[in-house]
Amino acid sequence: MGTGLENDKPIVVLTRRWPESVEIALAQRYALVRNENDAAFSADQLVAALTQADVLCPTVTDALTAEVFAAAARIGIRAKLLANFGVGFNHIDLAAAKANGLTITNTPGVLTAATAEIAMTLLLMCARRAGAGERLVRRGDWRGWYPTHMLSTQVTGKT
């Protein structure tokens, strides 16, 4: 992690890899510190990020506990913003973060459509036995259509 501002740019730490286009845009505007191995940060890494960066961008894999904030506070918390990548924030001790002067953001609503689409995918796969059919094809056991083969439930008209 950098020891100071590079070219007077605020230091932003990503605890996990983000989409490449986003990382490129961030690197143009900030002194960006990427997590090249894309593994969850340890408590020690989170403490280091809180004390050395201006902005920490955590994800659900980062346990920002009261203990992490207390350890960072003993050193001196530099970060002012936790820009959470995701909707959920139950991995962040909000009271401890606020007590240490951090602003916390998340992305509410960003997964609503995706969650509904995944639910529909699972519903259709179960009702129409799509997983079983795929396994037959992959094993080379597909013998073609016959009247009782892969009978399933119709979804149309159901609520």
Please describe what each predicted stretch is.
Residues 100, 108-159:
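Phosphate-binding beta-alpha-beta segment of Rossmann-like dinucleotide-binding domains, i.e.
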Residues 2-105:
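An N-terminal-biased, well-structured beta-alpha scaffold segment characteristic
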